[in-house]
Amino acid sequence: MNKNCISASWRCDERTARQVCSADDSDKMADCCKRPEDFQCPINKTAKLDFKELRYATKVPQTPVDTVFPETTANRVEIDAKTIQLLERLSLVNLDSEQALATLNSSIQFADKIAHINTENVRPLYTVLENQQLQLRNDEVKEGDCRVELLRNAKVTDEDYYVSPPGNIPLEQ
């Protein structure tokens, strides 16, 4: 390890290693940093993750893939004032400004584009870890009818429902 010191998955340049190791020349620095427990890589601008060497084969493309989203101008959704008032009341977000309405419209258009993407012949994703098998268990009921025991765990219940504290103070209309 003469020019680069490697600690876990971090690769540091020689200058950073010198600062940490307090060594004056490369030979001393290399001796200092041979043991990972002696070398702690600081998190700074010179430390970078090394993504060039992958441990496992991956299905994720290594270069960006251009995806053409279908144009949905024909299906453009118009939001009336009543719907905006309902959204304000449910989300507790004030949508009075033009910028807020523009953001809402662009979000709806983006969601509409995603909804129209062709996903035929795409296998469902069960786990984000490609190199590990996810063991799915059979959906069998082992302990049934434990509703009363589960409701005892809640501080406040109403009939057969949990009562949660309000997250925000509602807007005054």
Swiss-Prot record:
Question: What keywords sit in the KW lines?
Answer: ATP-binding, Ligase, Mitochondrion, Nucleotide-binding, Protein biosynthesis
| GO annotations of cellular component type | glutamyl-tRNA(Gln) amidotransferase complex; mitochondrion
Pfam families this protein is in? GatC
Q: Which residues form the signal peptide?
A: none
EC nos = 6.3.5.-
Q: Which Cys pairs are S-S linked?
A: none
What one GO molecular function would you report for this record? Answer: ATP binding
The task this protein performs is described as:
Allows the formation of correctly charged Gln-tRNA(Gln) through the transamidation of misacylated Glu-tRNA(Gln) in the mitochondria. The reaction takes place in the presence of glutamine and ATP through an activated gamma-phospho-Glu-tRNA(Gln).
User: Quaternary state and partners of this protein?
Assistant: Subunit of the heterotrimeric GatCAB amidotransferase (AdT) complex, composed of A, B and C subunits.
Q: Which family does it belong to?
A: Belongs to the GatC family.
Q: What is this protein called?
A: Glutamyl-tRNA(Gln) amidotransferase subunit C, mitochondrial
**Protein source organism:** Drosophila persimilis
Q: Lineage, please?
A: Eukaryota, Metazoa, Ecdysozoa, Arthropoda, Hexapoda
